[in-house]
């Protein structure tokens, strides 16, 4: 079996899944104290990198996703699967776990 090189462009979410690049978490507090990784809040904001074709309805039609590539979104804190690609953090989650489009 040949090795597959994973990049953002080779990840194709299925169904209503959305692939999001996670925004960087704060490295230090407002008072200037550096935070260790274990003390950082898990980010809940990111940019949509890839979008699946949409949820399959009972009649066989597809429900078009409400987000597009490039949208900045707010998502549920513990939703989805965390993925690391090329040093960047991503999360793969269902569209229902997206709470809002930001900006």
Curated annotation (Swiss-Prot):
Heptamer of 7 subunits arranged in a ring. Interacts with the chaperonin GroEL. One of its GO terms (cellular component) is cytoplasm. SUPFAM superfamilies: GroES-like. SMART domains: Cpn10. The gene is groES. It comes from Prochlorococcus marinus subsp. pastoris (strain CCMP1986 / NIES-2087 / MED4). It is found in: Cytoplasm. It comes from the Bacteria. It holds the Pfam family Cpn10. GO terms for biological process: chaperone cofactor-dependent protein refolding. Belongs to the GroES chaperonin family. Keywords: Chaperone, Cytoplasm. The keyword ATP-binding does not apply. The lineage of its organism: Bacteria, Bacillati, Cyanobacteriota, Cyanophyceae, Synechococcales. Coiled coil: none annotated. InterPro entries: Chaperonin_GroES, Chaperonin_GroES_sf, Chaprnonin_Cpn10_CS, GroES-like_sf. GO terms for molecular function: ATP binding; metal ion binding; protein folding chaperone; protein-folding chaperone binding; unfolded protein binding. This is Co-chaperonin GroES. Together with the chaperonin GroEL, plays an essential role in assisting protein folding. The GroEL-GroES system forms a nano-cage that allows encapsulation of the non-native substrate proteins and provides a physical environment optimized to promote and accelerate protein folding. GroES binds to the apical surface of the GroEL ring, thereby capping the opening of the GroEL channel.
């Amino acid at each position: 079996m040949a090795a597959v090189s994973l990049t953002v462009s080779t990840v194709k979410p299925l169904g209503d899944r959305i692939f999001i690049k996670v925004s960087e978490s704060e490295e230090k507090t407002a008072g200037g104290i550096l935070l260790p990784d274990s003390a950082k809040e898990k980010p809940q904001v990111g940019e949509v990198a890839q979008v699946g074709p949409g949820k399959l309805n009972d009649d066989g039609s597809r429900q078009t996703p409400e987000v597009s590539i490039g949208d900045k979104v707010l998502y549920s804190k513990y939703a989805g699967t965390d993925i690391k690609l090329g040093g960047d953090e991503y999360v793969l989650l269902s569209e229902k776990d997206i709470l809002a489009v930001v900006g």
